[in-house]
Amino acid sequence: MKNDSPKSIAFVLDEMYVGGTEKSLIELLNAIDYSKYKITLFLKNTSGALQHLVNPKVSVRCWYTTDSQTALINHVKKLEFVRAFEGLYYRCLARMHRNDWVLNAHYATMCIPAVGKEKFDCVVAYQYCSPSVVAMALHNIPGKKKALFVHGKANRAPKLNPFLEKV
């Protein structure tokens, strides 16, 4: 017997700014057959200029973020010294390489809690130039399949290439 329940897909993005990535996502969300798919959009912030254009059938949820210094202090307060040391290590590593991609990716995976117990059929990181979005989709949102949407030229951010090779 065929399973008629809709497939669940989660898209992960920073914010709904005015840009090509955001506009392409809005077009995609408007083209989806919502009788076949249940869509959730995870955003860091819901105050973007294009937020009002998101299809009302899409469930929009925020994902908690914190800056690296606050996360480091919180780990020390909780007596999580190994996590605090890891944070210091990655801060030093990012500064030595002058590469905030390393630091952003580390804190996205280590400091952002899982967003819930709901498991999606597919999780799509819809913003490849944002390590926190990629890491959030990869590590913090449960899903059977994971995908990375590359919109634009990958060579525009050469500092990102070593990070993407690990994904």
What spans do the regions from the language model cover?
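Histidine-centered beta-alpha loop that forms part of the nucleotide-sugar donor binding/catalytic region
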Residues: 14, 127-128, 150-153
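Structural motif
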Residues: 8, 121-122
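N-proximal low-complexity "stem/linker" segments adjacent to membrane-targeting elements
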Residues: 1-6
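An aromatic- and histidine-rich active-site surface loop
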Residues: 100-115, 123-143
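Membrane-proximal helix-turn-helix segments that form the acceptor-binding/catalytic region
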Residues: 109-119, 150-167
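Active-site-proximal region of nucleotide-activated glycan assembly enzymes
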Residues: 142-145, 165-167
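N-terminal strand-loop element at the rim of the active site
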Residues: 11-18, 31, 35-98
